[in-house]
């Protein structure tokens, strides 16, 4: 697995995955490994790849991480509004600039990795904290500059991830405080009594009901992993019923043992990234000694991932989406998924100790 990352995946995404004309990364490669050059590019993908490349031991990969982050900082803010871009045109001009919390979170996550590798991004971090402050709500943050509804669980989960990573990288307690604000939202608002995690809410954080509400088992598994990392990094108990949460994740699996995209019987699709989160959650729970009877071990999850998603003609690539019968639905591999795969593999290789 280490060799797959070092000799296949990182070379694929730092070489073929890089647009030589702009120095940015492609949004996706097709399943033959050819860049999808006509696709718009999400700014978050630039910095997610920066986060990944910063973890490499190769100096060239680390230099590319800083290059991508520098591009996002220098060219990612709209001149008139000052908002952070969401999407870029193929020529890298700004197409949309909603100043979305999800995007700000990943800018900050990339900064945490750059701090950890020794880069001087102090002034960038100060600026990004100011950009985040523009979204501050009485509890949590608004979803974007327009304060669009519904309120969303997902960007707050990534703020939890980012805040924990920034605390680990800097030791600054303000980041731990931010993580604990997100954790409070999770305990009080997002997590239901049966262990499922709700996605959408009204302005006052009242859960939406009926078809307006969605539950994604991949995000539930991601919370298991992130809460475990928070406890390890801060030394503080999260006061979350992890066994209940993880059991609800397992209950959401389909007949193959993999996670569908949504927690309902009508969902006929399953992407690759939720399986990486299932792997991370399983590794964390195994290390904690809290694996329930009948749960898969990490190697079982890895085997399913290999059979369904990772055994491809492109070394270091993956298949993105299948239906529940195993038929391939995707025609490209989004670069955004590399972040999920890299962290899952590194967590597995460490025995659940670190990434």
Residue ranges and their predicted role:
Residues 1-355:
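Glycan-recognition and catalytic cores of secretory/periplasmic carbohydrate-active enzymes
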């Amino acid at each position: 697995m280490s060799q797959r990352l070092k000799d296949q995946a990182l070379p694929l995404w730092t070489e073929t995955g890089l647009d030589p004309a702009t120095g940015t990364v492609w949004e996706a490669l097709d399943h033959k490994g050819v860049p999808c050059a006509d696709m718009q590019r999400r700014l978050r993908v630039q910095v997610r790849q920066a986060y990944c490349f910063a973890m490499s031991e190769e100096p060239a990969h680390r230099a590319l991480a800083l290059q991508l982050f520098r591009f996002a900082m220098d060219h990612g803010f709209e001149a008139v509004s000052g908002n952070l871009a969401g999407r870029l045109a193929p020529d890298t001009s700004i197409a949309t600039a909603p100043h979305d919390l999800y995007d700000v979170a990943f800018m900050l996550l990339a900064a945490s990795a750059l701090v950890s590798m020794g880069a001087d991004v102090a002034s960038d971090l100060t600026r990004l904290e100011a950009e985040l402050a523009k979204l501050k709500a009485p509890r949590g943050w608004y979803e974007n500059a327009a304060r669009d509804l519904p309120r969303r669980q997902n960007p707050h989960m990534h703020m939890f991830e980012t805040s924990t990573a920034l605390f680990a990288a800097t030791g600054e307690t303000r980041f731990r405080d931010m993580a604990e604000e997100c954790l409070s939202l999770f305990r009080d608002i997002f997590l239901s009594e049966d262990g499922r995690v709700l996605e959408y809410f009204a302005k006052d954080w009242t859960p939406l009901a009926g078809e307006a509400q969605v539950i994604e088992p991949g995000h539930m598994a991601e919370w298991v992993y992130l809460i475990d990392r928070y406890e390890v990094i801060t030394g503080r108990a999260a006061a979350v019923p992890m066994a209940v949460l993880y059991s609800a994740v397992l209950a959401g699996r389909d007949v193959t043992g993999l996670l569908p995209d949504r927690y309902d019987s009508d969902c006929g699709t399953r992407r690759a990234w939720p399986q990486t989160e299932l792997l991370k959650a399983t590794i964390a729970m195994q290390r904690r000694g809290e694996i329930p009877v009948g749960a898969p071990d990490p190697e079982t999850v890895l085997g399913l991932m290999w059979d369904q998603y990772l055994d491809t003609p492109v070394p270091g690539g993956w298949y993105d989406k299948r239906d529940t019968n195993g038929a391939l639905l995707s025609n490209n591999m989004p670069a955004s998924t590399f972040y999920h795969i890299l962290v899952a593999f590194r967590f597995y290789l460490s025995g659940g100790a670190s990434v």
